[in-house]
Amino acid sequence: MMESFMKIAVYCGASVGNEPSFATAAQELGQWIASRKNTLVYGGGKAGLMGVLADAVLENGGQVIGVIPTFLKDRELAHPGLTELHVVETMSERKRKMFELSQAFVALPGGPGTLEEITEMISWSRIGQNPNPCAFYDVNNFYHATRALYDNMVENEFLTQADREKIGFAQTTQELEAFIQAYEPPVIRQY
């Protein structure tokens, strides 16, 4: 069930990518987060989709919490207008802090870091360490191959169908909201 005023972690690229639809989707997601009075939790950067997303939330009256490691802040990559900025020492601390602050996890298009961050949250769900929903915001089928990989894991019995259904793939904010509202954590499997 979607809580009122959730904190939603969004992982995304520090680049805007090569499709205008990626930035458009980041803007739409930011507007949706603000319109629902939710708070964005993200990597704290001003570049790429991260900056587009944070700006969209802020421009629509929303709250934004950034979590950035010192080495990135020192390179002047932190967004200057955030509601809160947490500075941590390492990427591992950043991921842990974002996890502690958030009630849902979403991945916009991004690179290996984006994929690694959302995948870790999915993995934690499967072992009972993350009771919150994880979803890919699948802009222009960006995550089509990822979806196929999870389906292949089911086919080859490395992932149960029940656990696969706990991994969201949404192409609109309406689909994303419906997934978050209906989410129930996976049952922890017994070995």
What are these regions (language model features)?
Residues M2-L101, V139-Q174, A178, Y183-Y191:
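A cross-family phosphate/adenosyl-ligand binding-site feature
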Residues L58, S125-N132, F158-L159:
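Arginine/glycine-rich "motif VI" loop of SF2 helicases in the C-terminal RecA-like domain
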Residues Q63-I65, I127-Y137:
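Gly/Pro- and small hydrophobic-enriched strand-loop and loop-to-helix capping segments
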Residues K95-I127, A135, P186-Y191:
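Active-site/ligand-binding-proximal alpha/beta "capping" segment
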